Amino acid sequence: TTVGWKGLINDPYLDESYRIEEGLRLARQVLMEINRVGMPAGSEFLDVISPQYIADLISWGAIGARTTESQVHRELASGLSAPIGFKNGTDGNIKIATDAIQAAGRPHHFLSVHKNGQVSVVETKGNKDCHVILRGGKEPNYEAKFVQAACSELEAAKLPASLMVDLSHANSSKKHERQIVVADDIAKQIESGSHQIFGVMVESHL
């Protein structure tokens, strides 16, 4: 979104008090409880500083449509010890996601914050476990023809031809109840023998 609630870390009490220091503690507490019961946790990485506080508790991460093209987020992904999904652009552009995967797969050197809080030069090894998330653009892109087209782009970029589909956002026309319709289509693609979709992203309140 252009403006709006940025999440638990940024504004933990949803009252525009922006008590980020408390949000970081709450986020770690929630993630530790989730990990304690043996459930893997995922998170979207909005900025490049907060991951230092939570990345050890994250099993999978996402880079949003508006930040997939950001060089600093690609560098961040190159150093994270978890699979990272890059969403296609808000206009439906897949190439920015394939470019991001290629960039994140390579080593990088950049300024960041060390675990002790000091500004440091960071060297990453590259993250080969990155993938595309289809989230729709000017129109939904979850149907088989769009999945096939995206996988063809991945193959052309010499990347694995498999991806994740976001049931929400532009794929549901921002109507949460339409996620069921999208999920039904994805299930039929898999039932018909497609191996191109390995997972889905669902928006809900658990």
Regions found by a protein language model. Give the residues of each.
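Active-site-facing alpha/beta catalytic cores
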Residues: T2-Y142, F146-V147, H169-A170, K174, ...
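A structural signal for short secondary-structure junctions
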Residues: G126, A157-L159, S192-H195
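Redox- and metal-dependent alpha/beta enzyme cores, enriched for Fe-S-associated oxidoreductases
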Residues: A150-K158
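Conserved, mostly hydrophobic/aromatic
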Residues: V165
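C-terminal hydrophobic structural anchor segments
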Residues: Q179-L206
